[in-house]
Amino acid sequence: MKPNFSKGLIPAIVIEEGTKDVLMLAYMNEEAYEKTLETKRTWFYSRSRQSLWNKGETSGNVQYVQSLYLDCDQDSIVVNVKQVGPACHTGEKTCFHYQII
């Protein structure tokens, strides 16, 4: 089974192996998905830069892919990772650290 990239990008929800904490949300195009499968590290597509990026390539805060889950519509994916260092560029463990209610 493979994601449906007919719209170009799919959301990739990244969770931490063990805790299942949601670490971040990013987007993958087909090339990022294939590179993720090939390298077992997360690759995403930057909508602002319009280019691929490898999580942790410059910061060292890499994500090692443990498993991938495809949703029922085949248009979003959950990436289960072993996270090295913080996932968020702010230095927080997760990008979801602002509590609203």
UniProtKB/Swiss-Prot annotation:
Cofactor(s) listed: Mg(2+); Zn(2+)
Example GO molecular function: zinc ion binding
Keyword Cytoplasm: yes
Pathway: Amino-acid biosynthesis; L-histidine biosynthesis; L-histidine from 5-phospho-alpha-D-ribose 1-diphosphate: step 3/9
Residue stretches in coiled coil: none
Catalysed reactions listed for this entry: 1-(5-phospho-beta-D-ribosyl)-5'-AMP + H2O = 1-(5-phospho-beta-D-ribosyl)-5-[(5-phospho-beta-D-ribosylamino)methylideneamino]imidazole-4-carboxamide
Enzyme class: hydrolase
Residues reported to bind Mg(2+): D71, D73, D75
Cofactor info, note text: Binds 1 Mg(2+) ion per subunit.
Keywords per UniProt: Amino-acid biosynthesis, Cytoplasm, Histidine biosynthesis, Hydrolase, Magnesium, Metal-binding, Zinc
Localization, UniProt: Cytoplasm
Listed EC numbers: 3.5.4.19
One GO-annotated biological process of the protein: L-histidine biosynthetic process
Predominant place of localization: cytoplasm
Gene Ontology CC, one term: cytoplasm
Stored InterPro entries: PRA-CH, PRib_AMP_CycHydrolase_dom, PRib_AMP_CycHydrolase_sf
Residues annotated as binding Zn(2+): C72, C88, C95
Function: Catalyzes the hydrolysis of the adenine ring of phosphoribosyl-AMP.
Family according to the record: Belongs to the PRA-CH family.
SUBUNIT field: Homodimer.
Protein name per its UniProtKB record: Phosphoribosyl-AMP cyclohydrolase
Lineage: Bacteria, Bacillati, Bacillota, Bacilli, Bacillales
